[in-house]
Amino acid sequence: MEMLTSLSFLDKGEEWPPHSQTERLKKYADNRKRFKNKLGFDRKKYNHIISLVGNKFRVIDYKFLVNFYKKVSLKTSDLLFVEPPTISAGDDETKNTVIEQIKDLSDLDNIGAQAAIDASRYVDALLTIRIPSADDEETQAQAYIGITSPLFWFPVTSPMNLKEITQHVIAWTSTETIIENGKEKEVTYLDYQIHYKGHYERGRKYVEKGTIGDAIFVGQPVEVEDEEGVIGKQVSELERVDTGLSSFAIIPAQNVVTSDTIFAIDDYDDFASLVEELQVRLEKIAHVLDKHADPSLSGPTSALTYDEETGEWFLKMGDYYHRNSKEDPAVEYVTWDGKLESSFQEIELLLDLIAVLSEMGSAIFDRDSLKGSGLSGRALRLLYVNPLTKVRRIRNRFDRSFKEAIALCSEVGYEGKSVEKKDISIKWNDGLPNDKKEDAEIGVIRTGGKATDTIVAQIMEQDGLTKEDAEAKYAEIVKETNARLLSEEPEPNFFEDEEDEGEGEEI
């Protein structure tokens, strides 16, 4: 795939969308349909399958759509954000307050979950820094984090370094109905934003038959001076919007990226063909079972009855059909061995390969939870070794992207209380349920005879509380313990009198 190295793809007469990006955009669109289980019928794959299985199974129409794609993406998102990460700036209360404000305004946990799904299905998730107007009472002109679809993303890289993005272009088409010469006419527009560090430019152009046309002047009138020194007003094609940010307002949060491209690798390609083959096998099995449920009959001609009205012979069920000898055929259902055992064995093999290539292991099927077996925390994490490793790769990239997004947001509208990227710490969780017994055993060891942790810290870890809440809870425990000790009467000492009497005796 060729990279875009200039903004010339937005010029008049250029093809839209750019030819070099059509393969990427098609993959995005296909994966979006796969996620929604709406990819539909693929004629090329159908013809290939028919060439293998023959005309007998031309009824194959993909009515069994096994949506492993959605399962993989949702599982990835769950392991990242179903247990929200803890974001802080150490002990700096001012910076922590700013971070909490950004999280609340952005609905960051929900945005993160959406970004994880996009990184899985599209390979590229795009975080955006939204700069509201000063009149926005809800945000009070404070920047917050949003998300946009990579279907609208056209990054421009440096010709000298294809890994260096010089501009982010966000572009999309829309259709409107206008009145021209008294008649309705549909017009297609291309709206676009060219993002630079600290500002972006937005414009609009006509698109006709897939080709970019004239620009529509959208900028504010500005005073210009012509060659004769006459000052007039001119409207530009582009309108400049200052963001007040030190970097781009577009921040990619991606899946695995290789050294020869700026686009990531999606989760679906490696096992898509296996899912399609699995759907064919299920369709064939269903066809065989349907035929067995409505079988044909065989028997002697004497079993048939002639219908004088229709002129057709038919088999009247429930009658007695005599056989003159053992050699005469009996009336019976025609059945055959569909060799379903082999089909089920192949299905098991396909499922195993899907589990391996999706890097989800047996966790993708949730077989243990469906059987009702209770796994310990250690066993559950062993079961999820592959998914957790896969998610950790994405997490490493998300960590950098979310820190950058939070730091950029803090630059606009937070009374100058900006938070630097290096000050932000994100504690990621794995989304798996904790084993209370194992946690308690660890806690006893860590606070017992060889204590390596404070009781307050253990309360924070075991109960998921903040430091202030944990200290308050510990103070309440100490208070109740002291009150109980004071209320208890001391046990009587039955030997006290004997000891007192023995003190005055002489020996």
Where are these regions (language model features)?
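Extended, regular secondary-structure scaffolds
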Residues: 121, 126-261
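Extended, charged amphipathic alpha-helical segments
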Residues: 3, 225-381, 423
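Surface-exposed loop-to-helix/strand elements on domain peripheries
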Residues: 86-94, 98, 322-442, 481
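Extended, helix-rich architectural segments
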Residues: 1-167, 175-179, 499-507
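C-terminal structured domain segments
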Residues: 433-458
